[in-house]
Amino acid sequence: MYSSVSKRLVSVHILVVVALQLLFIPNVLSLNQTNAYLHHKCVNDQGTYNSGTPYEKNLNSLIRTISTLNLNFGFVHSSNGDAPNSVFIKLQCRGDSYFSKCRSCLATANSEIRRRCPKNKEKIIWYDNCVLEISSIDTFNKIDYQNNFFMYNAKDVSGDIELFNKNTRDLLHELKEKANIKSKKDFMYAAGEKGLGEKKLYAMVQCTKDLTPNNCNVCLNWIMAKLPKCCKGKQGGRVLSTSCNFRYELYPFLMI
């Protein structure tokens, strides 16, 4: 179902394997429960650490603390230790994947990213249900323009492609406005649908909850500008960074 491209072609072959697996997912419930691995990045800019060092001890302690939280709001930004051994963790779960699903995604993401990037101080991993970033630098309310990738549905749209692209843009921008309504329980997240004759277009947008509404707008506008490059004329697509993401499909993919 999916083909994929990333800014740095680190794990394209893995994404293609995931794409083929998604082709056989029988229903929406399975899609949400499988919590498919999407992508990861071992960042070298912040260097590495050794076993038994203060950085590793701070990281292990912070993970244990976060794992005890209820995660009812699907977001954590926390730190432990003082420079140069400070550790910062940011976890954002998808808007329909809070509570136990968020806790489960954290456990999976932490185990897998530390296996894939065992000694990198900065490492990021994306799953369907969450994104986990571990870093030695605080990224609170900062838009990450460096770490992003996109995936698209291999099936092309039939009919008027330009009209479909316009409807996709319109729905995503409508959801962007909804995501920034502070009174909403699911602030920084919005999902919806749009009728397209006999079909429906489903979409969602989300920002990490540490961003201000203005920065959320900036982030979503930035990734939405990638639509022509990533997903033009495709039945589905998504762009993900550590700060914000969107997805659209011609089938329901959320538990809403």
Curated annotation (Swiss-Prot):
Q: Which family does it belong to?
A: Belongs to the cysteine-rich repeat secretory protein family.
Task: Check the record and name the InterPro entries matching this protein.
Answer: CRR_secretory_protein (IPR050581), GNK2 (IPR002902), GNK2_sf (IPR038408)
As for subcellular location, the record says:
Secreted
Question: What species does this protein belong to?
Answer: Arabidopsis thaliana (Mouse-ear cress)
For this entry, the protein name equals Putative cysteine-rich repeat secretory protein 21
Gene designation per UniProt = CRRSP21
Question: In this protein, which residues make up the domain named Gnk2-homologous?
Answer: 37-139, 145-253
Concerning PROSITE patterns, the annotation shows: GNK2
A single GO CC term for this protein reads:
extracellular region
Signal sequence, renumbered to the chain: 1-30
Q: Answer yes or no on keyword Secreted.
A: yes
Keyword Secreted annotated: yes
Print the keywords alphabetically: Repeat, Secreted, Signal
